[in-house]
């Protein structure tokens, strides 16, 4: 009961500041397209190869369950998702689907924003990405104080912007026995997105919207399941997004509420496609 009450409190707090919106455009209580003109200015300084898309993060990003599966199968994908995929497929630098994985590309397990801060200059020099998705925080919950987390994240984002790289920020998923703390770190990311005028993928809010009472795969109600094969949005460890076999690469509404990686892949694809359109990097669709 205590866990349910905590989850409801977090959800109500988020709902109070989030307007009704679809998963792919959830950006908190921010004006529509608040980031478009600032990011156009950033992109005007970009000098690298178009279509390069870096993904800076921890184990939730380095895994081949994230991003790469979109290239191969999209069962039950809604029309707007297939349109977004076709646009992205025609634009994305091919190695960014699968090969930009590992520490030298800015994603590795067990890492925090401290690691990103220490290495961001090298990543930007090596990759010079047109757009970068950034999601750190899950490991920071038990090792990096919130004030330091926010300070270092702002520095990482600023370094990207200064180099001409457009940033997409992502909130982190809720976490077993650390729900309130994960919510606070996600709020910090929303504040950074607002202040620095960068687009946001609010993974945390979408998980709570879809599964307000039972997002946590570590809950006893899911004791019969193992590992990532849990039909809710977090795996049995209560840390990573779930990836149950029956919902892998499935983008039906049922799957988006039952497979954490399907939900994240959908949200990132749609936001990346929106950024491409709003920055006039791809032809307008009629």
Task: State each model region's role.
Residues 139, 157-187:
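Active-site segments of SGNH/GDSL-like serine hydrolases
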Residues 176-286:
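Catalytic His-Asp segment of secreted/periplasmic serine-dependent ester chemistry enzymes
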Residues 49-52, 127-133, 161-168, 196-199:
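Loop/turn elements at helix/coil->beta-strand transitions in domains of secreted/extracellular proteins
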Residues 21-47:
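Short coil-to-helix leader/linker segments, especially the first N-terminal amphipathic alpha-helix
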Residues 28, 45-150, 223, 249:
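Conserved SGNH/GDSL esterase-like catalytic core that processes O-acyl groups on lipids
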Residues 1-4:
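Positively charged n-region of N-terminal signal peptides that target proteins for export
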Residues 31, 35-38, 116, 120, ...:
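Stable alpha-helical elements in mature extracytoplasmic
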Residues 7-16:
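Bacterial N-terminal signal peptides
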């Amino acid at each position: 009961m205590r866990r349910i009450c905590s989850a409801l409190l977090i959800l109500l707090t988020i709902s109070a500041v989030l307007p009704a919106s679809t998963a792919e455009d959830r950006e908190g209580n921010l004006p529509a397209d608040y980031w478009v003109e600032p990011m156009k200015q950033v992109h005007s300084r970009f000098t690298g190869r178009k279509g390069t898309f870096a993904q800076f993060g921890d184990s939730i990003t380095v895994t081949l369950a994230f991003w790469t599966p979109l290239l191969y199968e999209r069962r039950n994908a809604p029309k707007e998702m297939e349109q977004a995929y076709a646009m992205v497929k025609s634009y994305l630098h091919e190695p960014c689907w699968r090969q930009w994985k590992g520490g030298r590309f800015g994603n590795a397990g067990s890492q925090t924003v401290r690691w990103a801060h220490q290495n961001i200059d090298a990543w930007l020099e090596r990759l010079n990405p047109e757009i970068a998705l950034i999601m750190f925080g899950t490991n920071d919950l038990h090792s990096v104080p919130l004030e330091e987390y926010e300070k270092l994240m702002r520095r990482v984002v600023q370094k990207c912007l200064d180099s001409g790289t457009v940033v997409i920020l992502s909130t982190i998923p809720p976490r077993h026995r650390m729900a309130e703390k994960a919510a606070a770190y996600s709020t910090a990311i929303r504040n950074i997105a607002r202040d620095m005028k960068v687009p946001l993928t609010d993974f945390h809010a979408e998980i709570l919207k879809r599964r307000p009472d039972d997002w946590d795969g570590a809950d006893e109600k899911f004791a019969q399941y193992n590992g990532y094969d849990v039909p809710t949005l977090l795996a049995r460890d209560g840390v990573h997004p779930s990836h149950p076999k029956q919902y892998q690469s499935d983008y039906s509404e049922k799957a988006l509420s039952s497979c954490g990686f399907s939900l994240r892949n959908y949200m990132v694809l749609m936001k990346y496609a929106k950024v491409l359109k709003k920055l006039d990097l791809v032809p307008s669709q009629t």
